[in-house]
Structures are given as structure tokens and as C-alpha cells.
A protein has these predicted regions:
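Short, cationic motifs built from Arg/Lys/His that form the positively charged side of catalytic pockets
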Residues: 12-16, 150
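Short alpha-helix capping/helix-loop boundary micro-motifs
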Residues: 18-23
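Cell-envelope/glycan interface and biosynthesis
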Residues: 66-276
Length: 276
């Protein structure tokens, strides 16, 4: 845990001691990057941090922690910070597919000694993910994460481009609207119009690999925004992923086999900050 970086998901008070009524040392603004110096206090949930030369304690539920710093053996491929995979009905989405949507790319991470992406997830949700990772490894798998925190403006941007494709391409519209059994879904199932749980840092998109980190196949590729990605068509791999994640308290999204979220923290703020 020592040396991991994290970001605040709101204005956060720094305290001298790991309790709420301790002396106030200052306030960290939303989206600021800080360094974690210890694990959180299991009783008060306060965690020791360093920020701009100030050392103190903040409430850990208000932090998005960088996953590679704390679970380095997971495979991380944040395609929205490289070349976005978003498609619908195997059709590229103009100005989205193949684009870097987040404005950052891999950077050298001194804590783990290699280049990697920023992968923020709400601190208590990251603890749950550790449990899922442990189960996956025990069963001969690994986790491969494609997305976690997503700024709200990116959600709205991708949705607008997706809607443009949906409204102009009949083949896309057909596969987004109806599954092969004739059940209606529609575009709202595949991308949020305004707010996503990704904007709160409580959701992640992921899949499984084998023990050698070779990605296993699901019924579709990652981020294929149409009815073939719904969980009613899960293959054995997608069902195994679902079993692992739900065993640790994660909730599913019926339209996306890859998406899991922690609804107990749904009151977390909607964030727009971009990582630097």
C-alpha cells in the first residue's frame, strides 16, 4: 500500500489523526493526486497520505486508488486511454473507435517498475476486487481490466457519437434494438445518456485470462455495444467471470457481460476530472 497513488472524488479534509474530529490540516480539491502512506484504519476508515508536503489522514471512502499500485499482477489494458474498442454491430463509431478518449497513455510507474496505465477505482471497491482476483488466481485464471473510472464528459461524448451511428445505420439499429429472440433492448441499455457508475469510480469492465495471461473468449469482443453482448448469451467464460465477481458483492449489468459495479457506493459523486 505504501507509495500507491490515489485521487480525491470530492473536496477532502486532511486530519492530523485518523479520526473525524482531529485537527484540520487543510483541504484537498476534487481530482487531486496524492500518495498513500499506510493501509486504512479498519475502525475509522481513515488512511495516512501525503499531499503537497502535508502528511495527515483522510477518509478512505473518498479516494480512487490506482489499481496497478496495489494489485500489480492483474492485466491492465485501458483501451480508452490508447485505442478505444467501442463498436456496435461490428461497426466503428466515428471519432471514438481507435481514439484515445482519456488524454493520457501509459506512464512509468516507479512503484511497480514498469510502464502502465492509470486505473482508478474507489478504495473500498478495490478491496472487493482483491477478493475477486484471489478467487480467479485460485481457480487458474487472472483478471484483465479494460476500464474503471471514466470522466462524465467522456460518457456523454461517446453516447452522442454512438447515437449518431445508431440513428444512421439500420444494421446497427437492428442489433442494438432486438436480440435474436426478438426481445427489445435499445441504445439506452448500452451507454448511459448522462451518468454512468464509471463516473463515480465504482464500476469496472473486465474479462478473464488463463494462467499465462492469454485472454479468454466471450460471446463478443470487449465494448461491442449491441444485443449480442447481453448476459443472456453468456458463454462459459463470461459465466465464470460473473460467478467470481458476484461472489464478492459486485452487481451485474444485463446488457454488458464485461461490466460490474458496487451499488453500495452509488451515492458517490459524479466526477468529470481527467487524470494527469
Amino acid at each position: 500500500m505504501y507509495g500507491a497513488i490515489a485521487w480525491t472524488n470530492r473536496n477532502v479534509n486532511i486530519r492530523r489523526e485518523p479520526i473525524e474530529n482531529s485537527k484540520l490540516l487543510g483541504t484537498i480539491p476534487t481530482g487531486a493526486k496524492l500518495t498513500i502512506l499506510s493501509s486504512d484504519n479498519p475502525t475509522t476508515k481513515y488512511i495516512k497520505i501525503s499531499y503537497n508536503g502535508i502528511i495527515g489522514y483522510v477518509y478512505s471512502d473518498f479516494l480512487l486508488i490506482n489499481l496497478p499500485d496495489v494489485i500489480p499482477d492483474i492485466v491492465y489494458y485501458i483501451t480508452n486511454a490508447d485505442k478505444s474498442l467501442y463498436k456496435a454491430a461490428n461497426t466503428s463509431i466515428a471519432d471514438v473507435t481507435g481514439k484515445n478518449l482519456y488524454g493520457f497513455s501509459k506512464k512509468y510507474n516507479a512503484k511497480i517498475g514498469k510502464n502502465t496505465y492509470y486505473v482508478p477505482l474507489l478504495y473500498p471497491v478495490a478491496k472487493q476486487l482483491q477478493g475477486a482476483y484471489n478467487i480467479a488466481k485460485k481457480d487458474g485464471y487472472n483478471l484483465k481490466i479494460y476500464d474503471t473510472y471514466r470522466p462524465n464528459d467522456v460518457t456523454k461524448y461517446v453516447n452522442s457519437k454512438f447515437r449518431s451511428l445508431y440513428n444512421s445505420n439500420n444494421n446497427v439499429k437492428k442489433l442494438v434494438d432486438y436480440d435474436k429472440n426478438g426481445s427489445y433492448w435499445g441504445p439506452g441499455w448500452f451507454l448511459a445518456n448522462n451518468v454512468s457508475t464509471h463516473n463515480k469510480g465504482i464500476a469496472l469492465d473486465l474479462t478473464l485470462t488463463d494462467k499465462n495471461n492469454n485472454e479468454l473468449k466471450a460471446q463478443t469482443t470487449m465494448h461491442m455495444l449491441d444485443t449480442r453482448s447481453t448476459v443472456k448469451y453468456n458463454n462459459s467464460m463470461a459465466n465464470k467471470l460473473r460467478s467470481i465477481m458476484t461472489s464478492q458483492g459486485f452487481e451485474t449489468l444485463e446488457s454488458e457481460w464485461w461490466h460490474f459495479q458496487e451499488n453500495n457506493y452509488s451515492s458517490s459523486p459524479i466526477n468529470t476530472f481527467h487524470l494527469k
